[in-house]
Each structure stands twice: as structure tokens, then as C-alpha cells.
């Protein structure tokens, strides 16, 4: 271990003595990419990508295990490997609470939220709110807010995290490598649709788990096992504690010593970096937005074959969420033990030399383990793991943002046919890629040591009003559109009142604290999320009680208490849905009408046929399956909205859910 500590201490930013540049590593990486491309091509041949439902919801035919694997892979991006390991290195075990909290919230998705989404017959979350409340403004507001968060938070986190790993492990040019990754991700997102994503997610989940297990084994062996981690972590401190900057000078020991509560999940409600009331309640609110109303996650559930498969997929995802504590957080702590002068650097000029940022280098904890501990071949496997995480997360964002833009914003154009929607959805992915590349300089210039916490705080300032709207929409039938809209607006203004000052003053660091006034910025962001959630919910209910209620005939199968209702529902968006249906030649399916009117027209050439197949847009052409009739579409819709379950399998998934919660409670209690 001493050799690794010395080597780590000597390594600077420009020292790339352990790059992935040998035949074994390159062969593993190439094999991985061939596997992913092969799975994507197979799913392109196997699945229906020529309809909106097929492209965006995988035809709602996925069984439980790809649903669960895709939920996990869509959530676990490279930001988790870099961010969780980095925060674990800096502050100890508590950050694993983010993952173990999700164990319970994902069950809420399967048992409470998904049944209503299914019976509502929707593709996107703003679509659900359009049916539930009517009007356009809530749907449009949420679509724009979600796209904003996708582009400027989720993509930026993945771009930064992937860039950190590539820079540390490869020494490649950041722009060239990330643009190449974005390009490959875009290809199988544009061509394959959601089914291709979910099958490749399944493959990548196994790659992620296998590679992370291998590295964890090497890390624990190097540190002396599980007991070695807990014996040595509290003594993992940098020896370089005097800054060359006279304004900084001798740095306080509180800035470089591990926290006294590093081994505890539940920390002091006032002085803790993750106070236990905030972790249990505030995080549940933010997690509720992400797991129960965020398009990236819910879209995977809506692709399930039936409600039982959706619930089983949520359970599988929950079991997988047990692993980040041991596969990411603890390896990050081990990295601090092995390389304290790098991972735990505190002097601004030292950190600048090691990782290019002055606020700290804890984010290099996981990449440093890969570069220094893994042998040839396995090092390439771990790069493949990081690429898998990055590409999976980005592909999920690309597909889901495409769905949001196409189904919630572009459909405001009343004469948009299905072929046009499919084309626009694919072009939107290309646009997102271009924005991502343009955003790279901003990400690279960001203070990386604070990026992970920054993203969590941004979610806490913007997400609670959305969580409040979805909770009351499902469980309080009396709530109406006016209440929901003004609750969202009031919550947004309240969140911006905290977000803008924090943006302006910066988050600072232990060595150079932020100048933001205490009454604005010193309240923990998860405490703020609790206040924001209840204020938004209260405003929603007050405005709703002061205005006319929505008649019950519009609420059948749109609220939890009426999810099994058999009465016919009069959708508040019925006029919007009926408008394109007549006359069909002009609006509903213009491409089919053209084919019927011009049967004598010559078919497309060979190259055009191949291109149309590659993009999944050859449905209804010669040799392809005929478009479904209106009766077939209605029957399929009734089948997909059915939430009845086989009693035997329903009991099986319920027992598994109880077992998973018992296991989670044991771990919470053990590390509390």
C-alpha cells in the first residue's frame, strides 16, 4: 500500500504512466463496442420502430428483467462512478443514502404511480397532466422545464464525469473522445428507439456490475480488506497543508481531516453535511420527482408488458441499487487511503496541478483506482464500464427528451402526421447532440469538485413543486388546473429565489468559503426542498378549493382511487385528440393516404429502402407490415391500459417487495 501512496503522491496532471494503450485493453474495448452495436442491430431487426408507440415505448412489450436493468442503467451514469466515489472519498458513507433511499421510492413508482399512468394511456408525464387537468400551459411548462434540466444538468454531469475519467485514464483529447461517444450513442438512439435502448441497457448493466465488482475486489485487497478500510480511512490525510498563496497560508485541519461521522449514514440534523431529517424526508421528495415523474425513468416502466412485469422490474432495480455503497462509495474511500496527496488534496495550487481545479480532486478517486490498480485487459474492461454508463445515461436522455419534444411540444402543430413525428423525434436527438457538444467548454470550465453537489441542489430548488403537483394529481381528486398551475409558478419563483443567489455567489469551498448571505444559502438544500414541497402543495390545494372542481366524469382512471373504474372517461383533451382524426387523408396518417392514392408510383430504390429500414420508417411500404386498423388500435389500447394482475404472480412480486424492503432496512440500521 505504501508504494501506491508514494506513487500516487508523485503523480501530477501531466504524468500518464498507466494509460490504456496496450493491445489487451484495446481489444476489450473494441469487443465491448461490437457487442453493443450487435445488440442494437438485433433489436432493430426484432422490434417495431415504425410507429410512435414502437419507437418511444418499445411497443409496451418488455418483460421484467430488461425493465429493471434499464431503470438501473438509465440512473447509474458515469456521474455516479465519479460523483459517488468522490463524495465518499471526501465525506464518507452518507452519500450512499441517496441510493438506498431510492430503494423505497422505486416501489412507489411500481405500486402507486405506474398503475395510474397505464390506465391513463399516456406516453409522457406532461401528457398525463394534460389529461388530468386539461389546458396546455401545465404540459408546456413541464416539457420546457424538463428539457432545460436534461440539457443543462443531466448532460453536463455525464459529460463532466466522462471527461474526468477519460482524461485520467487515457490522456485523450476531451473533445474528440466525448464527441465520438455522443456520435455512437446518437446512432443507436436515432435508429433503434426505446427497445434498442432497453436491450443495450440490459447488456450494459451486466458490464457495469461485473466491472465494478472486479475493481472493488482489487481495491479491498490492496487496502487490507473490509476491516482495513475502516481502520485506515480516518488517517487518510494529505501531507501538503500549507498553501503558497499568502491569502490562504496554513489550512485549517477541518478542511483536510476526514469527518468524525464518516462511518455513519444518519448525521447530526444541524452540523451534518447530510442531516438525517433532510436525508429521510427531503431526499424522498426529490427522489419522488426523479423516480415517479421524470420522463427518463417512467418511460422505461411504461414499456413493461403489464403491471406485474413493471413491479418486478422495479424490484430488480431496487436490489441493484443496494450495490453502489459497496461498488462506488467504499472504493472512493479506499482511493483516498491509497492516494491521499492527490484525492484528498487541499492546497489550491496542488489540486490545480493534480486535476486541473482548485476546489479539490476527490472526483478523480475512482479513475485513479482504475489506472493504478487494474491489470491490462481489466483496465480496458473498466473503461468499457465507464463508457457503458456514460452512453446509457446519455441515450436515455436523448430518447426521453425526443419523446417530450415530439409528443408535448411539436404536436401543437395540428397537422403533424405519424411519419412527421417520427422524423422530428430523430432530428431532435441530433439537435441535443449538437447542444451537448457546444456545452462541453462550460462543463470543462466548471468547478468540478462542486459539480455533483451542485446538481443535487439544483434538483432541490426546481423539482419539489413538480413532485407536489404529481402527488396531489394522483391522490387528491379535488385539485384542478388552476391550483396545479399556480402551485408550479409559486414554487418556481420560490426556488429561483434560492437558486439565483447561490449561482451568483458560487458554492465556494472549505479553504475559500462562499460569500452568499447565511439566510439565503446556509440552509441545507434538502431542508429547503422540504419547505418548498409543502409550500407548493399548500398553494395548490388553497387555489383549487377557491375555484371550481373538475367533474368526476373527467377523472376515471386518472386518479389512484378511480384506477379500476369501468365508466367511460370524457378526456379534457378530447378535442385535441379528435381533431387530427378526420379527415384521415389530410391529418391522421397522410403517408398512408398517399400510398393508397398512388399505388402505381415506383417503389424506392435499394439505397433508399436500406436507409428507411435503418431509421425505422419503412412501415406500411411494400413488403412491410400493413398499418393497423382503427379497431385493432382500439383493442390494443384497451389491452395496454389493463392493470389486472394474475393473483399468483401478484403475490410473488408483493412478497419480493417486502423482502427487498427488509434487506434495505437492515443495511440502513447497520450503517446508521
UniProtKB/Swiss-Prot annotation:
User: Which ranges make up the Cytoplasmic topological domains here?
Assistant: 45-63, 115-136, 296-309, 407-423, 477-481, 547-651
Superkingdom in the source lineage? Eukaryota
One family from Pfam that matches here is: SSF
Q: How does it sit in the membrane?
A: Multi-pass membrane protein
Which tissues is this protein detected in according to the database?
Answer: Expressed in the small intestine and kidney.
> Which cellular compartments is it found in?
Apical cell membrane
Subunit record text? Forms a heterodimer (via TM13) with PDZK1IP1 (via N-terminal transmembrane helix); this interaction enhances SLC5A2 transporter activity.
Q: Return the protein name.
A: Sodium/glucose cotransporter 2
Organism expressing this protein natively: Oryctolagus cuniculus (Rabbit)
Q: Which gene encodes it?
A: SLC5A2
Amino acid at each position: 500500500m505504501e508504494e501506491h501512496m508514494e506513487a500516487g503522491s508523485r503523480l501530477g496532471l501531466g504524468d500518464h504512466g498507466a494509460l490504456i494503450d496496450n493491445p489487451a485493453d484495446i481489444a476489450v474495448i473494441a469487443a465491448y463496442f461490437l457487442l453493443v452495436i450487435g445488440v442494437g442491430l438485433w433489436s432493430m431487426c426484432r422490434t417495431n420502430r415504425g410507429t410512435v408507440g414502437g419507437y418511444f415505448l418499445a411497443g409496451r412489450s418488455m418483460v421484467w428483467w430488461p425493465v429493471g436493468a434499464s431503470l438501473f442503467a438509465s440512473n447509474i451514469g458515469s456521474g455516479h462512478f465519479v460523483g459517488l466515489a468522490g463524495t465518499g472519498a471526501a465525506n464518507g458513507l452518507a452519500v450512499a443514502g441517496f441510493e438506498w433511499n431510492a430503494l423505497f421510492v422505486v416501489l412507489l413508482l411500481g405500486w402507486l404511480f405506474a398503475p395510474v399512468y397505464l390506465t391513463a394511456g399516456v406516453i409522457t408525464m406532461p401528457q398525463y397532466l394534460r389529461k388530468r387537468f386539461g389546458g396546455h400551459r401545465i404540459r408546456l411548462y413541464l416539457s420546457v422545464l424538463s428539457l432545460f434540466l436534461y440539457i443543462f444538468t443531466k448532460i453536463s454531469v455525464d459529460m463532466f464525469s466522462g471527461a474526468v475519467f477519460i482524461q485520467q485514464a487515457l490522456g485523450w483529447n476531451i473533445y474528440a473522445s466525448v464527441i465520438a461517444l455522443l456520435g455512437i450513442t446518437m446512432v443507436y438512439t436515432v435508429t433503434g428507439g426505446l427497445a434498442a435502448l432497453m436491450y443495450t441497457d440490459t447488456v450494459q448493466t451486466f458490464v457495469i456490475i461485473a466491472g465494478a465488482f472486479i475493481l472493488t475486489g482489487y481495491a479491498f485487497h490492496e487496502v487490507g480488506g473490509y476491516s482495513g478500510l475502516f481502520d485506515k480511512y480516518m488517517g487518510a490525510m494529505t501531507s501538503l497543508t500549507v498553501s503558497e498563496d499568502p491569502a490562504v497560508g496554513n489550512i485549517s485541519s477541518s478542511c483536510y481531516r476526514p469527518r468524525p461521522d464518516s462511518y455513519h449514514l444518519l448525521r447530526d440534523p444541524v452540523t451534518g453535511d447530510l442531516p438525517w431529517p433532510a436525508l429521510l424526508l427531503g431526499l424522498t421528495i426529490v427522489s419522488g420527482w426523479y423516480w415517479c415523474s421524470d420522463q427518463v425513468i417512467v418511460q422505461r416502466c411504461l414499456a413493461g408488458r403489464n403491471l406485474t412485469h413493471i413491479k418486478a422490474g422495479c424490484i430488480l432495480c431496487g436490489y441493484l441499487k443496494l450495490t453502489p455503497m459497496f461498488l462506488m462509495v467504499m472504493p472512493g474511500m479506499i482511493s483516498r487511503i491509497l492516494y491521499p496527496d492527490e484525492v484528498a488534496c487541499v492546497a489550491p495550487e496542488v489540486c490545480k496541478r493534480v486535476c486541473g481545479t482548485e476546489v479539490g480532486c476527490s472526483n478523480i478517486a475512482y479513475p485513479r483506482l482504475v489506472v493504478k490498480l487494474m491489470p491490462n485487459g481489466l483496465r480496458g474492461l473498466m473503461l468499457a464500464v465507464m463508457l457503458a454508463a456514460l452512453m446509457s445515461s446519455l441515450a436515455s436522455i436523448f430518447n426521453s427528451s425526443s419523446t417530450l419534444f415530439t409528443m408535448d411540444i411539436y404536436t401543437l402543430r395540428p397537422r403533424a402526421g405519424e411519419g412527421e413525428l417520427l422524423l422530428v423525434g430523430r432530428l431532435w436527438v441530433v439537435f441535443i447532440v449538437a447542444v451537448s457538444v457546444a456545452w462541453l467548454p462550460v462543463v470543462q470550465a466548471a468547478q468540478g469538485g462542486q459539480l455533483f453537489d451542485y446538481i443535487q441542489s439544483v434538483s432541490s430548488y426546481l423539482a419539489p413543486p413538480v413532485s407536489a403537483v404529481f402527488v396531489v394529481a394522483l391522490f387528491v381528486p379535488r385539485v384542478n388546473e388552476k391550483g396545479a398551475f399556480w402551485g408550479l409558478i409559486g414554487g418556481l419563483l420560490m426556488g429561483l429565489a434560492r437558486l439565483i443567489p447561490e449561482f451568483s455567489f458560487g458554492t465556494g469551498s472549505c479553504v475559500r468559503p462562499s460569500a452568499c448571505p447565511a439566510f439565503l444559502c446556509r440552509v441545507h438544500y434538502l431542508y429547503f426542498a422540504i419547505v418548498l414541497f409543502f409550500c407548493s402543495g399548500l398553494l395548490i390545494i388553497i387555489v383549487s378549493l377557491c375555484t371550481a372542481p373538475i367533474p368526476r366524469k373527467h377523472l376515471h382512471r386518472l386518479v389512484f382511487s378511480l384506477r379500476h373504474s369501468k365508466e367511460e372517461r370524457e378526456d379534457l383533451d378530447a378535442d385535441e385528440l379528435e381533431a387530427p382524426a378526420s379527415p384521415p387523408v389530410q391529418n391522421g396518417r397522410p403517408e398512408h393516404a398517399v400510398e393508397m392514392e398512388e399505388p402505381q408510383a415506383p417503389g424506392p430504390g435499394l439505397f433508399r429502402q436500406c436507409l428507411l429500414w435503418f431509421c425505422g420508417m419503412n412501415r406500411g411500404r411494400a413488403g412491410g407490415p400493413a398499418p393497423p386498423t382503427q379497431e385493432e388500435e382500439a383493442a390494443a389500447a384497451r389491452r395496454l391500459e389493463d392493470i389486472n394482475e394474475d393473483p399468483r404472480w401478484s403475490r410473488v412480486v408483493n412478497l419480493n417487495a417486502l423482502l427487498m424492503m427488509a434487506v434495505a432496512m437492515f443495511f440502513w440500521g447497520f450503517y446508521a
